[in-house]
Amino acid sequence: MNPSEMQRKAPPRRRRHRNRAPLTHKMNKMVTSEEQMKLPSTKKAEPPTWAQLKKLTQLATKYLENTKVTQTPESMLLAALMIVSMVVSLPMPAGAAVANYTNWAYVPFPPLIRAVTWMDNPIEVYVNDSVWVPGPIDDRCPAKPEEEGMMINISIGYRYPPICLGRAPGCLMPAVQNWLVEVPTVSPISRFTYHMVSGMSLRPRVNYLQDFSYQRSLKFRPKGKPCPKEIPKESKNTEVLVWEECVANSAVILQNNEFGTIIDWAPRGQFYHNCSGQTQSCPSAQVSPAVDSDLTESLDKHKHKKLQSFYPWEWGEKRISTPRPKIVSPVSGPEHPELWRLTVASHHIRIWSGNQTLETRDRKPFYTVDLNSSLTLPLQSCVKPPYMLVVGNIVIKPDSQTITCENCRLLTCIDSTFNWQHRILLVRAREGVWIPVSMDRPWEASPSVHILTEVLKGVLNRSKRFIFTLIAVIMGLIAVTATAAVAGVALHSSVQSVNFVNDGQKNSTRLWNSQSSIDQKLANQINDLRQTVIWMGDRLMSLEHRFQLQCDWNTSDFCITPQIYNDSEHHWDMVRRHLQGREDNLTLDISKLKEQIFEASKAHLNLVPGTEAIAGVADGLANLNPVTWVKTIGSTTIINLILILVCLFCLLLVCRCTQQLRRDSDHRERAMMTMAVLSKRKGGNVGKSKRDQIVTVSV
């Protein structure tokens, strides 16, 4: 075989791989398990909560106790990691039963309403014109016109009689009322000049008894300036209405039925015959357009009024005052002057002017009252949150103490387009309700951030590296701390605002009640502040409840209390009636429930959950602090040095004493030896030379 053939049959040479390192790197990256992919349904893990960390600490402590291992920070950490690994690795059994824990919860400002009753304090009703209607003004209402007239069906309960206006049982009936200023004249044919305003008001119950007077009640007379019987001096030269509150001689009864008795001590002027000094039979019948059955029709069509008689006409109860109804039976409540502002704005007011003339007929004086009107003014009255007006076919049922209304409308303003075929019910937002809430874990209170900070302060401010160890704990407390801080700032700001508004309102009442023109912008700002105070008052009451209660750590908008819900003691029908606002014998006893919950909260205030565990962890972390070690070593070295010095001193003293004893012993031995040598010699030193004696003695 020639060399060329041998060369052709030789095996081919292997090519060297230059990319062995990249292949090895890829082999190292190969895995046999399934690749973990992030799915759209995958949720981001939340930071550990305080309850989870506390439970983990408890489980780790129990595990170490069962295994009889000393509880050190290192062993606690390893036990906690082992428990977490077991919990994560073990699958959740399908159909596992979830424990159910039901506690009482306080929900502030729920989306519920309740009726404003005669026992509530008067509310703020704003008008757009304070020249003809006294009271706070605001021409920017409604605040949200797009929300006016929203449909609603209500079924709510009440304890005290609710405030309702309209033609329905349990509601105050509307009527037309006149307010007149009487100015005397000196003309021989004119006795008085009149300026009068007619508008919608509240209808009294009229009993045509002797002299056709209204039925009056002399009970529950309020304190105040009585209305004058004669024309006030300040009214003799004025042509404008000056509203001034006064108390009439007797009260008008506005309602007296199964819903209660409501009276009004405001004056209600009317024309009557002055029969003083008359020898003939003088009819004392009162003729007044104050009460008209046709309501708005009398204000629209009747533009001229004339009264004629052979006897002089007099206007009774000379003061211009607004109605102030109040309930006196079955309970006695405060006056509500704001209701008149709602009724007077339901239709325009009419302005009248006229006089009373004196003529002679059949040789007798003849008196004529002539009133004419050519001016009407539309008005608007509004309420602001948390108050609202429910308008519709309202039905009040006193037997069941419920109020129902289907297809009603929610309004905040009433104007001259209102139809009195409907009724007006004043409502407001509920301040808070108590309801049972179900949880899948036991109730646990929030840890005390103050105690936690005090316990860990010595660790955190000495060793910065421990901050990374405590990140998990602190992350669970950020939400609680932020909530507490915001609540504290809100309370502080609210108190400051209340004081500021109270200081600013000292001189505002006289300004609002006067008829002089005021700056509209300033008035709107003051009204906003007044309404803000009312709203903040409700918020402060809710915040006060929150401060008195111990709440679960995982709630911020409402408070889950430690009081367990007992179905046998408070069945759901009682809770339902409470949500409806009904308060009767079958309704949830809120006062008793509050007392039980406050007692349970007090019991939990003395026991701050997790404090012992936190203190143990802090002590363990403090032992790991190198600074502590250095301090311990330093203090131990000083003590040891002192002890060593003392020992050395004692040892030196012993050595010196030993040496001295040895010297003394040597001297005694030498002396004894010398004595022995001398005693063995016969004759002693006799016959010896002096030198030999000295040598012998020295030896």
From Swiss-Prot:
Region annotated Disordered, chain positions: 1-47
GO annotation, cellular component aspect: plasma membrane
Q: Where is the signal peptide?
A: 1-89
Q: Give the source's domain of life in one word.
A: Eukaryota
* Site positions (Cleavage): 465-466
The similarity annotation says: Belongs to the beta type-B retroviral envelope protein family. HERV class-II K(HML-2) env subfamily.
Protein's name according to its UniProt entry: Endogenous retrovirus group K member 8 Env polyprotein
